[in-house]
């Protein structure tokens, strides 16, 4: 089954189920740690097919997606080219910066920030092929994680600081397409006003709640509210951004 031949209803249903259950998780520690989330011996035939399909979608998006190409350009401008080889790429088993892999149920993937002693360009993104069911879903996911990467490179984010984490989650949810009108309707979230803002807050709280430094949902809600005004209106690297409205 390919992106072009898949039953549109099935693709929409699978994508909705994945998005309803999956928020963009607290950044994973290191791509090296999860470079083979499922070994070839444990991958099913469906996992292998999904991984190959996702690799093709990724290559297509890097060539044709205005959003993905924009983020690649602006990451490169701040010396964080996501497509360049790693400094230690000659080492056997070193994963690419954009890693497509099959993942077990407890790994959702996400942005993997570089350790403090390493250049921010050595960060990366893990994309779990068996959790992504359409090219559009992959496009939004890559865009979301690249906004985290841009923040990490531009602002040297401390991901253990809840205010830093909340700010990047607000920006990523708002700017990536995560909270566009159609996506929210597919998630069964509808509001007569401020639908975009409600989505950004909800998804920001979910992500911050997954941070080990966050002790409760109330704490996550308070942190998101505390940084909301400055972070929601910060649209860098975009000059301006048009939010969906109804």
UniProtKB/Swiss-Prot annotation:
Entry keywords, A to Z: Hydrolase, Membrane, Metal-binding, Metalloprotease, Mitochondrion, Mitochondrion inner membrane, Protease
EC number(s) on file: 3.4.24.-
Coiled-coil spans in chain: none
GO MF annotation list: metal ion binding; metalloendopeptidase activity
Active site: 145
Top-level taxon in the UniProt lineage: Eukaryota
GO annotation (BP), single: mitochondrial proton-transporting ATP synthase complex assembly
Residues at which a divalent metal cation binds: 144, 148
Membrane-protein topology: Peripheral membrane protein
Subcellular location: Mitochondrion inner membrane
PANTHER family per UniProt: MITOCHONDRIAL INNER MEMBRANE PROTEASE, MITOCHONDRIAL INNER MEMBRANE PROTEASE ATP23 HOMOLOG
Role of this protein: Has a dual role in the assembly of mitochondrial ATPase. Acts as a protease that removes N-terminal residues of mitochondrial ATPase CF(0) subunit 6 at the intermembrane space side. Also involved in the correct assembly of the membrane-embedded ATPase CF(0) particle, probably mediating association of subunit 6 with the subunit 9 ring.
Family to which this protein belongs: Belongs to the peptidase M76 family.
Name of the protein described by the UniProt record: Mitochondrial inner membrane protease ATP23
């Amino acid at each position: 089954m390919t992106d072009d031949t898949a039953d549109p209803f099935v693709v929409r249903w699978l994508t909705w189920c994945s998005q309803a259950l999956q928020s963009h998780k607290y950044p994973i520690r290191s791509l090296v740690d999860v470079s083979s989330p499922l070994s070839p011996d444990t991958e099913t035939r469906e996992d292998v097919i999904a991984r190959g399909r996702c690799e093709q979608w990724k290559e297509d998006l890097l060539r044709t997606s205005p959003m993905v190409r924009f983020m690649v350009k602006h990451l490169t401008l701040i010396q964080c080219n996501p497509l360049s080889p790693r400094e230690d790429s000659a080492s056997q088993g070193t994963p690419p910066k954009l890693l497509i892999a099959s993942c077990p149920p407890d790994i959702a993937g996400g942005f993997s920030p570089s350790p403090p002693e390493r250049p921010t360009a050595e960060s990366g993104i893990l994309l779990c092929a068996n959790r992504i069911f359409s090219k559009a879903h992959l496009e939004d996911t890559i865009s979301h994680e690249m906004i985290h990467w841009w923040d990490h490179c531009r602002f040297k984010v401390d991901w253990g600081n809840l205010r830093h984490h909340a700010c990047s989650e607000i920006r990523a949810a708002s700017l990536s397409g995560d909270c566009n009108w159609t996506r929210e309707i597919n998630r069964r979230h509808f509001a007569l006003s401020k639908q975009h803002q409600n989505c950004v807050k909800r998804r920001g709280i979910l992500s911050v709640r997954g941070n080990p430094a966050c002790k409760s949902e109330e704490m996550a809600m308070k942190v998101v509210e505390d940084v909301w005004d400055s972070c929601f209106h910060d649209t860098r690297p975009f000059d301006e951004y048009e939010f969906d409205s109804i």
